[in-house]
């Protein structure tokens, strides 16, 4: 099985397969409540994480929200 290449936060990353954004977030062990996702220059709403697919050549930016004072 061949891997797919994506760009995640400006760096090449290889995934075992095509997956949706929710699966990628889970694989990266991120808290879905504390991130924002952009795919191919478009913001992905959290209610679309199961529908939006991460495929060969996808460009994603994932931003973490950090609390502080």
Predicted segments with their positions:
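Ubiquitin-like/PB1-type beta-grasp interaction modules and other compact soluble beta-rich domains
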Residues: 1-68
